Each structure stands twice: as C-alpha cells, then as structure tokens.
A protein has these predicted regions:
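Boundary/entry segment of secreted carbohydrate-active catalytic domains
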Residues: 1-37, 41
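Solvent-exposed loop/turn segments at secondary-structure junctions
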Residues: 18-20, 55-58, 80-84
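A generic short-segment signal for beta-strand/edge and adjacent turn/coil regions
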Residues: 19-20, 42-44, 94-99
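Soluble non-cytosolic domains of exported or imported proteins
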Residues: 29, 33, 52-55, 101, ...
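Catalytic domains of carbohydrate-active enzymes, especially glycoside hydrolases
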Residues: 33-57
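Substrate-binding cleft of extracellular glycoside hydrolase catalytic domains
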Residues: 63-118
C-alpha cells in the first residue's frame, strides 16, 4: 500500500477518453489504442489522472498504464446513483423506490469494483 500513498502534490487532470459515438451509458468505451494515444499527449504535462467510474474504461486505462509503462498515478472514482429521493434537487431528485433499490445494488457493485481495482 505504501507504493500508492501519499499521492502528495501532483499535476492532475480529470480524464475521460470518450470520443464521438462513445458513451458509458451506451457501454461504448474507448479502445486501448485510443487511450494510449491520449496518454502520449498527456505524459510529461500531467502526473495523475482522475477517473470517474470503475467501468470498462477504467479497466482499460489501468491496463494501458501497466502494459505500456506510462508514469501516471490514478485517482479512482466511483460513479454512484441516487439511493434516496430529494424533491429539492433542481435536476430531478424524485425516483420510484424500485429505481432507488436498483441504484443501491449497482452502487454496492461499483464500490466493490473500486476496492478490487485499488
């Protein structure tokens, strides 16, 4: 674990390699070649990447770093959906209970993926 902490002061950027026609919602993710191409542009200017979710994109990012030796630290994100309704939320905070329960289950899987990838 000491290899990962502390992150200290780093030049960091939020990274999402999605191109036109790609979307995490549609489950269409950047290829390893596209990610590596991005990393060649980012290396030297950035030390750390912040990712948004523990999905296929995240897995590919970590694989490209390991396989091709890019020198990036990764701040892993977890994409969590609403588990409670919030009627005061301006962008739609009311959800049926079955949706909230589905979100709770998916959130649990997302956290488990984050722990496994960390």
């Amino acid at each position: 674990m000491s290899d990962f902490l502390p992150l200290g002061h780093k030049r960091a950027i939020c990274y999402s390699g999605f191109r036109d026609g790609q979307s995490p919602d549609a489950r269409v993710f950047p290829s390893k070649d596209e990610i590596a191409s991005d990393f060649r542009l980012l290396q030297g200017d950035w030390d750390a990447l912040r990712l948004y979710a523990c999905d296929t994109h995240c897995e590919r990012v970590l694989e490209v770093i390991a396989e091709q030796g890019f020198d990036f630290k990764v701040m892993l994100g977890a994409y969590l959906a609403a588990e409670l309704s919030n009627p005061n939320c301006p962008w739609g905070g009311q959800h049926p209970e079955d949706v909230l329960e589905q979100n709770r289950q998916e959130n649990l899987r997302e956290v488990e993926r984050a722990i496994a990838l960390a």
